[in-house]
Amino acid sequence: MKSKQNFFLKLLAAILICEAGLFVTSCSTARNLNELDSFSEPQEEQKKILRTIYSAGIKNAESLYKFFIAKCPDGNKAKAKKIAKLYITECQTEGINSDIAFVQMCLETNYLRYGNLVTKDKNNFCGLGAIDKNNPGLKFKSMKEGVRAHIQHLHAYGTTEDIPLKNELVDPRYKFVKPRGKATDIFGLAGTWAADKEYGAKLDRLLSELEEF
């Protein structure tokens, strides 16, 4: 009798251990499935670049550089890296959107290949003062000064009188932007900064491409 009791006790214990094992396995499996579900959920949507001139850019210098080289594989890589960093720094100082300024530079200079009135030696990255062959654009003494002049000109377009410049003025045409704040976003640059009515749309397309980097 006692041996039968021991047998049934051992059998019961074995059943309980087996069930416990199945429970643990089931829980582990469920946990793993939950982790997979969590992993497969879409990540937060990539932040969109603002089209407002007086705003913060979201791309770092490395992303700007990669965008430039993707669009211009034969471009000067060292110069592209340097100018990307300059745009980040100068824009942060004045509160101007560095993404907008950088793609505008790409559009205006054909990715630093130039080819119109403005020539490479001028350090003019946005066509400042370029009207005709008698007025082929302003010349700046360094890349940094040229980038700063570009940012300051955007500042004149994108901000009002109550927002002063932080750096010393190097843009000779800053004072000619009237009224101040005439183009708060890229679309306002069409017909103002450039005669091209599609100018804002062209910048918009470039920004959409930059968002992928």
Annotate each predicted stretch with a short phrase:
Residues 2-12:
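Bacterial N-terminal signal peptides that target proteins for export
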Residues 2, 23, 27-213:
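Catalytic cores of secreted/periplasmic lytic hydrolases that degrade extracellular macromolecules
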